[in-house]
């Protein structure tokens, strides 16, 4: 299942008077789900820690974002994608969006996990690396082609790290529960 268009997510976000970008919303949602948070229609209220937050319109871009993200994270073919910015955006905008995504992921993960979950050694490293990325900024990159390649590699690392954490906190326990 494909993620909705970034612009559609941004537009619906503005209609709900949210100050978060599409990247931040997707990062928070992915963190929430990876930390074991429930897949529910009120996900925005949960990741924003705002019980007064209105749920996204059923079938709207934000609802599609939740549904597609859940499907991608559970896909055995590793079809998970990051929702950042529009294709063709400048390097600085893509870099900022990725680091914003990582910051929001950590927030959502912390809200869902509430306390330190039992992670594999690789999961611990992935979480620490995501925390380091969350502290970075686009100032660490310039417009060189090497930086464009480096950003693509970092995006791929983030994608794999998220799936690893989701595996540690959600898929692993679910599998162990089936065995018992």
From Swiss-Prot:
One of its GO terms (cellular component) is cytosol. InterPro entries: YgfB-like, YgfB-like_sf. Disulfide bonds: none annotated. It comes from the Bacteria. Belongs to the UPF0149 family. NCBIfam families: PRK04758.1. This is UPF0149 protein XOO1028. It comes from Xanthomonas oryzae pv. oryzae (strain MAFF 311018).
């Amino acid at each position: 299942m494909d993620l909705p268009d970034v612009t559609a997510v941004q537009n619906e976000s503005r209609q709900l008077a949210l100050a978060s970008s599409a990247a931040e919303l997707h990062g928070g949602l992915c963190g929430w789900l990876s930390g074991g948070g429930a897949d529910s229609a009120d996900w925005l209220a949960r990741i924003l820690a705002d019980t007064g937050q209105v749920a996204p319109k059923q079938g709207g871009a934000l609802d599609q974002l939740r549904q597609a993200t859940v499907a991608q994270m559970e896909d055995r073919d590793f079809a998970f994608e990051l929702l950042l910015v529009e294709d063709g955006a400048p390097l600085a905008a893509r870099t900022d969006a990725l680091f914003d995504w990582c910051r929001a992921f950590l927030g959502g993960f912390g809200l869902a996990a509430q306390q330190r979950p039992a992670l594999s050694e690789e999961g611990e490293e992935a979480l620490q690396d995501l925390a380091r990325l969350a502290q970075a900024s686009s100032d660490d990159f310039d417009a060189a082609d090497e930086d464009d390649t480096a950003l693509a590699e970092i995006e791929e690392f983030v994608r794999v790290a998220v799936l690893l954490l989701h595996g540690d906190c959600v898929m692993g326990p679910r599998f162990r529960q089936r065995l018992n």
